[in-house]
């Protein structure tokens, strides 16, 4: 059994005389683009303040003036006009955190003794650990859990291999496999740097569906070697979740593993995104009163996520889709040796449109962006059909400013938690694997993906459904179980 390690809340537990530094990659991916205070950049400061109550108020004022958001303030000690206080506040990025510290140190009678970044504190020693399901407290326990008693269980599996699902962790365990080549918005950062993300993924599996997942970060980019390694470790796992492997290698790796293994293989960057997009679109089209088979859909980005989104939408009945990359529409005259792009060309863009993304938006009903930030303006969205649906999913900066899009679009969704209608893969993968493991499934089909999307969409009732609530929140406990149930019924 795997267990999420409890977080370390306050500086009282762990002190640093200087803050743990954020990497330049993290700043580039998040810090310089996030302008509002965020829990991603929560800091806790221990401060000496001279001058009594008014001085403490001045400290609070200074933090507010520098646009940080105070979460908590606790008096640690107070004696002879000197207070020691712990202040926890959200900042916008690493530079903003340092500005807050510098501003406090510049005040008369104020000294920042120590400060820490709570995100880094949460990660000290990792976020997950192994825990025992059965205690081993004496020789009797030991003789059953290990030698000699375990030999009987080994031979039972040897004689009846199907019993591995009943008698080992395989029945509830998933490998989260990456080579670290396409990590979030950070790109090719390697397997070691990818590990915190994979730990986080494993924690989400456990938190939302009680699935025991474990990171497997591979120090190779060779397609054949990755396939070989995953096949070799597969006997331990009931499923394989491929994560953050760059395109186009991810397509071949998934396809080959699905063909050669007898357990489900799921590339979340492709299909997890596609499931949640379809779920959100099902409900968004209800809001605007349109049918999937009738609407014209523009998809910006035809990599792993875009490819899977297009395939799943077609499987659900969409008939009018055009895919776009940085060079414009994918059309019959633009075929290459990339089989996945060519498949999109052969199955979409029936009118063979050859223009740019901005041109393709004119008169479109739906925009789905899985590409790059700030490539469109509110004026571009205004050229879409009435009752437009806009899913701007690039992170951390959407393809178009959500507020600008909302001036003319009927429904707007992003991949971010600070806007309504967050399209987040965590709505899909925990429940999906819960259902697959429960059913001891060996494959994942398009019908299963569609069923998962329908299950997510169904959590939002007709009474709740509106333009700012088309998709349930990630902490809605109904989501995972409903998805799991849909998968069990499909298997």
Regions flagged by a language model, labelled:
Residues 12, 22, 27-124:
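A conserved regulatory-domain signal marking ACT and ACT-like small-molecule sensing domains
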Residues 264, 268-269, 288, 392-491:
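Adenosine-phosphate binding glycine-rich loop
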């Amino acid at each position: 059994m795997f267990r999420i390690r409890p977080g370390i809340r306050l500086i009282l537990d762990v002190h640093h005389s200087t803050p743990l530094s954020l990497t330049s990659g993290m700043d580039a991916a998040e810090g310089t683009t996030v302008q509002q205070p965020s829990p991603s950049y929560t800091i806790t400061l221990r401060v000496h303040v001279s001058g009594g109550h008014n001085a403490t108020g001045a400290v609070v004022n200074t933090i507010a003036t520098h646009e940080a958001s105070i979460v908590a303030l606790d008096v640690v000690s107070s004696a002879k006009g000197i207070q020691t206080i712990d202040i926890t506040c959200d900042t916008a990025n690493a530079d903003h955190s340092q500005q807050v510290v510098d501003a406090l140190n510049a005040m008369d009678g104020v000294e920042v003794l120590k400060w820490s970044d709570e995100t880094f504190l949460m990660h000290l020693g990792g976020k997950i650990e192994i825990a025992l399901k059965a205690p081993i407290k004496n020789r009797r326990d030991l003789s059953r859990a290990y030698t000699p008693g375990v030999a009987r269980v080994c031979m039972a599996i040897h004689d009846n291999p199907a019993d591995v699902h009943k008698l080992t962790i395989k029945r509830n365990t998933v490998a989260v496999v990456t080579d670290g080549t396409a990590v979030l918005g950070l790109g090719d950062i390697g397997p070691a740097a990818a590990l915190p993300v994979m730990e986080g993924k494993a924690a989400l599996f456990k938190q939302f569906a009680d699935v025991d997942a474990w990171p497997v970060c591979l120090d190779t980019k060779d397609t054949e070697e990755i396939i070989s390694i995953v096949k070799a470790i597969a006997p331990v796992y009931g499923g394989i979740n491929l994560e953050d492997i760059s395109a186009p290698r991810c397509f071949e790796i998934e396809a080959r593993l699905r063909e050669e293994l007898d357990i489900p293989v799921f590339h979340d960057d492709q299909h997890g995104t596609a499931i949640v997009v379809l779920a959100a679109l099902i409900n968004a089209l209800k809001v605007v009163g349109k049918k999937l088979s009738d609407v014209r859909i523009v998809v910006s980005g035809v990599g792993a996520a875009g490819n899977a989104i297009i395939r799943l939408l077609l499987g659900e009945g969409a008939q009018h889709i055009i895919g776009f990359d940085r060079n414009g529409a994918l059309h019959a005259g633009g075929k290459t040796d990339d089989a996945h792009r060519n498949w999109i060309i052969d199955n979409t863009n029936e009118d063979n449109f050859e223009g740019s993304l901005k041109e393709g938006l004119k008169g479109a009903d739906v925009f789905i962006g899985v590409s790059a930030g700030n490539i469109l303006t509110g004026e571009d969205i205004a050229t879409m059909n009435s009752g437009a649906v806009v899913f701007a999913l690039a992170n951390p900066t959407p393809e178009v400013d959500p507020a600008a899009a909302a001036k003319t679009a009927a429904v707007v969704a992003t991949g971010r938690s600070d806007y309504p209608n967050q399209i987040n893969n965590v709505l899909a993968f925990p429940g999906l694997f819960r259902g697959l493991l429960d059913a001891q499934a060996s494959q994942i089909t398009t019908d299963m993906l569609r069923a998962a999307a329908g299950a997510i969409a169904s959590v939002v009732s007709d009474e709740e459904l509106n333009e700012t609530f088309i998709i349930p929140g990630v902490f809605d406990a109904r989501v995972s179980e409903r998805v799991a149930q849909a998968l069990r019924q499909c298997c």
